[in-house]
Amino acid sequence: MPEATLTKKIIIAIDGPAASGKSTTAKQLAQKLSYTYIDTGAMYRAVTLKVLRDAFFEKIFSDELFLKKLLSETEVILKGEKVFLDGEEVTKDIRTNEVSSKVSKVSSLPLVREKLVEYQRNMGKARGVVMDGRDIGTIVFPDAELKVFMIADAKERAKRRYAELKAKSPSGDPGVTLETLEQEILQRDEDDRTRAIAPLRKPDDARELDTSKMTIEEQVAAIYELATDVISQLK
């Protein structure tokens, strides 16, 4: 497609379970389209990091007034690929296995979702964005012009997360076994699917993409083709 036709901007919503390749693919797709990439998962991870650091994890589930005050005093900002929590860069801190194991529980809280969904909608309302998460196509932007639901085999997702943790560890030790990661991913899937607020589900009008045997480059190319098709049909 000629580049001139790509000047029309759309919202691309990419949803799917943990470690299905959403964030890396969405980031590279945004670069290819010259769009803004919005990592909604990083926002939920930042809030999760805050409650874990301050030992408030249990309290936020039993004291709504406390949670409301905590959220009113919490600022999450995305600047490119960097994530800031209350003025501190936490880009690496939010990717620990501890945060990964707790984020689904924290993001199930209505007050947390309400605050972050409002922020996400404000960021994307100008269009020209690629946003990934669990409920982008169903809750945040149900009117997105392109919705993609990425899936992958749990074993493959565990391998990806294992390689990611290993690469980020100074010692090369991921600090967790592959088997444990697979169990945690399966548990996270269950938590995401069964939570009362904004459960993980494929939007009726989403294109499903199984990434189990796909490289990141192939994933980006597949969604780029879908995006250009959608843009070409805009009047």
Curated annotation (Swiss-Prot):
InterPro entries named in the record: Cytidylate_kin, Cytidylate_kinase_dom, P-loop_NTPase
Location(s) in or outside the cell: Cytoplasm
Any single biological process term in GO: pyrimidine nucleotide metabolic process
Enzyme class of the recorded protein, top EC level: transferase
Domain of life of the source: Bacteria
Catalytic activity: CMP + ATP = CDP + ADP; dCMP + ATP = dCDP + ADP
Cross-referenced CDD domains: CMPK
The enzyme's E.C. designation: 2.7.4.25
Residues holding ATP: G16, P17, A18, A19, S20, G21, K22, S23, T24
Keywords for the protein's UniProt record, in alphabetical order: ATP-binding, Cytoplasm, Kinase, Nucleotide-binding, Transferase
PANTHER family in the cross-refs: CYTIDYLATE KINASE, CYTIDYLATE KINASE/PANTOATE-BETA-ALANINE LIGASE
Family: Belongs to the cytidylate kinase family. Type 1 subfamily.
Protein name as catalogued: Cytidylate kinase
Provenance organism: Chloroherpeton thalassium (strain ATCC 35110 / GB-78)
Gene: cmk
